[in-house]
């Protein structure tokens, strides 16, 4: 009896072609790779779950940002109060006091803007205070209250915020804070003079404010350039 030849086409079950062996090997390799990948993922998940939480890196400007934020808020509150005091002075026919309060309010807004820009530059954020208590009283009362507030703030801070910025090597923030402190003192001096001259003084004093840094003058003869930021006096705003 003649035995038929076994070939690819008529091979009995159980006999496989070389291509079938290759497919089986490839499938086995894929299974091993998937197993290894799964094991790696599980190991990573376990490590992530048991790893202690990573603490966020603190900003090197935390103290400086807090000082700038506090300065911004003071300036914002004073600008609102001074505008209110100017309205009261106008009602009492105190034109010099009205102009002074208007000039100081404008100066405070400029300083607030500069402080807020410094905060953003250092990676922080600033939101102005919403609720501000407005005082009434006479113009002389408001002058006395404002003078006391400026002097008290200067005594309490005694330049500490400037020193902190300098020790951190942040001369940009220190410059903003130096200007703010200097203008607080300037405001107090101008208000003391206005309170001293009283309501019967001649209406002759005019005030000028540098539109860049908020430096304020009470003089007819001005510096050619603002000594704080070098802005030309032709740009000064008159009140």
Feature roles, as predicted:
Residues 25-239:
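Non-heme di-metal
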């Amino acid at each position: 009896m003649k035995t038929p030849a076994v070939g690819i086409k008529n091979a009995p079950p159980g006999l496989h072609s070389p291509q079938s062996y290759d497919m089986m090997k490839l499938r086995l390799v894929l299974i091993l790779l998937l197993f290894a990948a799964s094991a790696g993922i599980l190991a990573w998940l376990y490590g992530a779950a048991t790893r202690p939480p990573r603490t966020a890196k603190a900003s090197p400007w935390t103290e400086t940002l807090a000082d700038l934020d506090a300065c911004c808020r003071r300036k914002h509150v004073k600008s609102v109060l001074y505008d209110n005091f100017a309205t009261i002075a106008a009602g009492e026919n105190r034109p010099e006091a009205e102009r002074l309060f208007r000039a100081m309010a404008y100066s405070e807004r400029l300083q607030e803007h500069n402080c807020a820009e410094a905060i953003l530059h250092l990676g922080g954020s600033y939101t102005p205070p919403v609720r501000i208590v407005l005082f009434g009283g006479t113009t002389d009362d408001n002058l006395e209250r404002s003078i006391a507030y400026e002097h008290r703030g200067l005594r309490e801070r005694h330049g500490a915020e400037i020193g902190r910025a300098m020790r951190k090597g942040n001369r940009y923030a220190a410059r903003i804070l130096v200007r703010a402190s200097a203008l607080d003192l300037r405001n107090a001096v101008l208000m003391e003079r206005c309170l001293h001259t009283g309501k019967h003084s001649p209406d002759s004093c005019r005030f000028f404010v540098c539109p860049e840094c908020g430096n304020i003058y009470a003089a007819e003869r001005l510096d050619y350039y603002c000594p704080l930021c070098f802005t030309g006096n032709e740009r000064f705003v008159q009140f």
